Amino acid sequence: MLLKDQVALITGSGRGIGRAIAHLFAKEGAAVFLTARTDKELATTTGEISRGGGRSGYATADLSLESDCAQAVAAAREKFGRIDILVNNAGHYGPVVPVEDYPLVDFDKVIAVHLRAAFLLSKLVLQEMYARQSGVILNISSLSAKAAYAWGSGYAAAKAGMLGLTRVTAAEGARKGVRVNAICPGPVTETQMSKDLGAVLAKKMGVNEDEQLAGFLNGLLQGRAQTAQEIARAALFLCSEQSSAMTGQSVNVDGGVAFY
């Protein structure tokens, strides 16, 4: 087992990529503590993990709030005693509009859920990790941080900011036993966020949803979407000792779009 006896705090883990990461980490021996905004999905996911013989716990949290970030970390420590791995995965796309029409309140919300929450949660776990000279932080960024797509300025800015945070935190933690990396997923069309976004984009483009998706996927070298399980496998690699020489990296899992 690649994560035996490790404790992982995984945000945005009631469904989609976070849920897939939680299941795989539990299968590989980690105790997983999950957060999301809704109780029902968390209860379902932790129940599945427990029935499979894994260890899990959860707390609902709105990670745009500093108080909820602190409460999530405290709840994970209360449940399992420590945090060895932090996966910042919570996500919110925001309005699909051009920059000139993007409401500031929505921009601030997207930045808060992605970048600000990743900063706050990292800040809350780093002292513990430094004291042990051991720990891993993984930030789930996006292809949008590297490729240019219209109508998503808040999301792109937040995800690009996460890459900067990744590099700085990696530089600070490298001699203290802490590794920090990021994943930039491409389109994971099975997630609700991707489905909702596709519907909005199709309407703006004057095509149906299947046509919009086919056109987008045609721009990928592999010509297909990624799966949540593929992102989870990359997350497992980056959070295990198999990637012990890697820190400060942003790993593209995008089917062949970004090459840096």
Language-model features, listed with the residues they occupy:
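Alpha-helical segment proximal to the catalytic Tyr-Lys
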Residues: 127, 171-172, 244
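Substrate-binding pocket helix/loop in short-chain dehydrogenase/reductase
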Residues: 97-99, 103-111, 198, 216
